[in-house]
Amino acid sequence: MKTPTIPTLLGPDGMTSLREYAGYHGGGSGFGGQLRAWNPPGESVDAALLPNFTRGNARADDLVRNNGYAANAIQLHQDHIVGSFFRLSHRPSWRYLGIGEEEARAFSREVEAAWKEFAEDDCCCIDVERKRTFTMMIREGVAMHAFNGELFVQATWDTSPSRLFRTQFRMVSPKRISNPNNTGDSRNCRAGVQINDSGAALGYYVSEDGYPGWMPQKWTWIPRELPGGRASFIHVFEPVEDGQTRGANVFYSVMEQMKMLDTLQNTQLQSAIVKAMYAVTIESELDTQSAMDFILGANSKEQRDKLTGWIGEIAAYYAAAPVRLGGAKVPHLMPGDSLNLQTAQDTDNGYSVFEQSLLRYIAAGLGVSYEQLSRNYAQMSYSTARASANESWAHFMGRRKFVASRQASQMFLCWLEEAIVRRVVTLPSKARFSFQEARSAWGNCDWIGSGRMAIDGLKEVQEAVMLIEAGLSTYEKECAKRGDDYQEIFAQQVRETMERRAAGLKPPAWAAAAFESGLRQSTEEEKSDSRAA
């Protein structure tokens, strides 16, 4: 007696077993076998990034230099993350340090005043090259991180006795970080970064700028930290998984599309120029046999002579009877020729829609909105514009916290150590820890950059006032959203109030009345919109 055969249940494709088909499709061949030829290797970040690291960054550099959309993406990062002034808001951890809150506030005011004098000096003493203020260095760092995936800053010491502070910083291009003598990567030296067995960076190999190529390339090893804990070389990037040594630039996911879009735009422009260049064409009759003789016999001297003679006859005829469109005379054409007027044609042919689709894809990869990347705000309502701005704002705030603020805080700590040693600022006497014992606690701070873009100024102010009145926010947070320091605003308001009183001016009561009127009008509009909905 034969054992009955149990039929195998198959999936929708009729080939894959149902048991296999019920699993994750991404690891299989896919419906109809679409994924069968897609077999990428499983690699670590360094294995995927470092072999073509130099070429990838060079391509990103070329995009930023020669592609308008790429340059705009970098500009958006600089303007929305940093802005025109990257303001320090020093807030030491006074509870941990064992000092009073008022002592901490007094110390912070002293530190902020000294820091601003040092960092934003027009003489650019903070920069080794004497080209940048502190805000300019942060803007450069954000741009460097965007199109190179990382930023480097070297903390140096000025030996000149003419300045109060000797601390200086040098912006270092990621192109200069490489293995000495351009050797291959090893377990403890990858792409110019010396690491220990745990993957922590110990130092960096920095090559000298050899332009214009008249001197041999040399490398200098710079430690990450000095023995006392002071930062010597600042390296900021966002790793995506463990074991990553260098940063990946933001253009990797959209680099191919951006290059092809650039080529497409140039081709479209050339096509439009060609179509607009020729207003009239003269078509000459040539029988098939003669045409094939000219084409196939192009290497024959006899055929070349025949072709030259034929073209010469045409040129001689039209030299005697030139074709002109601006004159009143209607010319006689050579027998067999026809005069065709070329009308202007639509050069778009669906190009704009295709370009928008590509730009939306590119904007998603770069973390900005399509409207910001393309500078096209047409056909947008307030709600759409606000949602788009909020999405980009969340991305920019993450970059401000983990890129710009990290660079700024490490630079600030280097300066604060010297300021304390030189007694430019004085630590509170009752502090539990010294600066060397609690660097992070003494240097704890926030950084205020550019404010959030206001779509409707009145509604945004009303929202801020309501949040403060409801206890859901503070003046500090709302002013920071606008790129301002609430303490500076309060101090300025006190000065202005005293000056108005001294001048015999009344408080601007009309401002409060106008605000209440606008608030009532906005509420009525929202109620009418809800009724209509």
Predicted regions and their residues:
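Surface-exposed loop-to-helix/strand elements on domain peripheries
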Residues: 122, 128, 328-455, 516
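Activation/maturation switch segments at domain boundaries
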Residues: 2-4, 337-348, 390, 458-533
